[in-house]
A protein has these predicted regions:
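Aromatic-rich, solvent-exposed beta-strand/loop patch
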Residues: 107-111, 118, 133, 138, ...
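Ligand-site clamp/hinge motif
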Residues: 127, 216, 247-300, 341, ...
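Detector for C-terminal structural segments
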Residues: 8, 15-19, 69-71, 234-239, ...
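Extracellular/periplasmic solute-recognition and catalytic clefts
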Residues: 166-168, 231-242, 267-331, 338-342, ...
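Surface-exposed binding/hinge segments that line
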Residues: 125, 159-207, 226-234, 379-393
């Protein structure tokens, strides 16, 4: 007579319940918890590392750094969809990124992490010593509450965390996240990036007895846990942060040599020209220059000549995403790809680069410029494996021609490109009609083709105006509208525009965020980053191929495939990029001999140099 499983357990002297518990214990013992997570298991630093290579372990603590910020703020809660938020809270996450690796995170609030090979779940062990600024311990309950609270508070988090099925406490200092899908390599990293919020604070009451609500704006400084805490807030004007002397994570390897300034201040300006004048007047210390004109002509003031201000180009190993004129394809006028293509033919980048930008820029031709993920030449065999099943839904040129932008380097080419644009508009049903003495593009219903460029900085008008002239030569009516930042944010969050300056930033390891940039669900969700309104099942499938890539080669192939599909659909009019940061600073700071590969590292790994500061003051 064969023995049943229950009989075997009895012979072993164990009850079924005890045996199951023993199996669970054995499984737990088989789990190899690690100190770090990486997208493809290529972790640089070992478990016993002492510090990151790009820091100065002997960096002095002290001094201050001041930043200028364009805009204003009426809210200090960074987790809600509402209001204009100021930087006043610093909440640690379970993990923190290394600045010299593409996609690796090391333990911060979490001391160790484990996931199975199929990435169906991830388990974190929390550090018992982790604390909020009020001294209360960071617990598993805080982690679990944070995930749901963030989902409720902001559409981005709700989308970003949508494949997290549940979070639950699995030990005294342990949290388990279970996922609704297997094979999504980025999901463990996404959970590691989540800021851990203090449940007791957000569910409590303020000093006036009012119930706090993470879904709403507030000017009360939220409780944090990081290395800095807000010390002074002047609504709409400035925020002063001070380093927490007894910060719980000071001695962790990920903290050594970082956060060296005693004070960080953010000073707000409503006008970019006023902000630059404030920098010249030593009202703040550090500036990343976004204006080619100012970079070429503006840094000739006395402090530069006296070497009090240093300008420097800092090259980075980073992906240059797509900055563009983003066309809102939710609107009928942009539904036909030929209209969108015509607008690219009308944009004279070469004239703008020579006459406005001092020749500093390279024309963007990819959503992954300056990286191995940029599509070049014709599709490879690996790319075709993704593309062929979708061939009937794709532009045929994608398979036969490398994507390039029209070039307007001569008067002849400008005329040629305008003729091509006119032919494309004709083919799309927008033909020229004389009306009130003007040549206008109209459709079959007699509606004129009109475009509004929505801007929030006057500096963009100098770029839009020459483009307007080219478009008007085609019979298109153009209105350039510059609004204040608050109105701009309201309109862009609800996609109330024809054309805006769009930016699709990319990391070295694209993943789940591509759904928010290009996914169909995001196209209909207010506040998403899908500014164009792309709702294409082909794009959705390729985005999934990115997310579920099994190795780096597969990820690169899927990104190149997405690049081809996006560019050949002409969703945007590409602008330009530069492969370095243009920086200017008052010369009061020291830095490591080698900066991290993927970040300028300011102010994280820089420090106050008292000797330099004294020299600047003496000049």
């Amino acid at each position: 007579m064969p023995l049943s499983r229950r009989s075997l357990l009895k012979l072993a002297g164990l009850s079924p319940l005890a045996k199951i518990a023993g199996i669970q214990m054995a499984l737990a013992e088989d789990r190899e918890f690690k100190h770090a997570l990486s997208l493809f298991d290529d972790v640089k630093y070992p478990a016993d590392f002492k510090h990151f290579d790009y820091v100065n372990v002997d960096a002095p603590k002290g001094g201050r750094v001041r930043f200028g910020v364009l805009g204003s703020f009426d809210n200090l809660n960074p987790y809600t969809f509402k209001g204009e938020t100021g930087q006043a809270v610093n909440n640690d996450a379970l993990l923190t990124s290394s600045l010299d690796e593409a996609s690796t995170e090391y333990g911060l609030v979490a001391s160790a992490v484990w996931h199975p090979d199929d990435r169906s779940m991830v388990i974190y062990r929390l550090r018992p010593e982790a604390r909020f600024h009020d001294g209360k311990a960071i617990t598993a309950e805080d982690v679990i509450w944070s995930m749901q609270a963030l989902r409720d508070a902001h559409p981005f988090y709700n989308s970003y965390y949508k494949n997290i099925a549940k979070a639950e406490q699995s030990g005294d200092h342990e949290v388990t996240f279970s996922f609704s899908q297997t094979g999504n390599r980025e999901l463990p990293l996404i959970t590691g990036q989540m800021p851990v919020l203090p449940k007791h604070w957000w569910t409590g009451k303020d000093d006036k007895g009012r119930q706090r609500n993470i879904n709403e704006t507030t000017l009360e400084v939220p409780l944090g846990s990081g290395s800095y805490v807000a010390a002074e807030v002047k609504p709409g004007v400035s925020i002063k942060m001070k380093r927490v002397a007894g910060y719980w994570g000071n001695d962790l390897p990920v903290s050594v040599g970082t956060d060296n300034f005693d004070e960080i201040q953010y000073i707000y300006f409503r006008d970019s020209n006023v902000m630059f004048e404030a920098f010249k007047g030593d009202q703040f210390d550090w500036r990343i220059e976004s204006s080619s004109k100012i970079w070429a002509t503006g840094y000739d003031f006395p402090a530069v000549k006296k070497n009090q201000v240093v300008t420097e180009k800092i090259a980075l190993k980073q992906v240059e995403g797509m900055q563009c004129w983003a066309l809102n394809v939710r609107r009928g006028k942009f539904k036909d790809a030929r209209v969108r293509q015509a607008l690219n033919h009308a944009f004279d980048f070469e004239w703008s680069n020579a006459n406005l930008f001092y020749g500093q820029y390279t024309r963007s031709r990819s959503y992954f410029n300056n990286s191995e993920m940029e599509a070049k030449g014709l599709p490879t065999a690996e790319e075709l494996a993704l593309l062929e099943p979708l061939r009937g839904q794709l532009p045929p040129e994608l398979f036969t021609t490398e994507f390039t932008n029209p070039v307007n380097d001569t008067p002849q080419n400008r005329r040629k490109n305008l003729r091509t644009a006119s032919q494309l508009l004709d083919a799309a049903g927008w033909t020229v009609m004389q009306r009130d003495g003007k040549s206008l593009r109209v459709n079959g219903q007699g509606e004129a083709l009109s475009l509004e460029f929505l801007l929030y900085e006057p500096i963009w008008e100098r770029v839009a105006l020459p483009y307007q002239q080219q478009l008007e030569l085609l019979g298109i009516t153009v209105n350039i509208k510059t609004v204040d930042l608050s109105q701009y944010e309201r309109r862009t969050q609800t996609f109330d525009y024809d054309i805006i300056v769009g930016s699709f930033g990319q990391s070295l390891s694209p993943g789940n965020e591509q759904r928010d940039l290009f996914g169909s669900e995001a196209a209909g969700r207010n506040g998403s980053r899908n500014s164009v309104g792309i709702a294409d099942p082909v794009v959705d499938k390729i985005v999934d191929a990115i997310i579920f890539s099994k190795d780096r080669k597969g990820l690169v192939t899927a990104c190149r495939t997405l690049d081809r599909v996006l560019t050949w659909n002409h969703f945007v009019v590409p602008m330009w990029f530069i492969p370095y940061e243009r920086t200017a600073r008052w010369d009061r700071f020291g830095r490591p001999g080698k900066l991290p590969d993927y970040s300028v590292g300011f102010p994280t790994v820089w420090w106050w140099d008292a000797e330099k500061a004294a020299k600047v003051a003496a000049k």
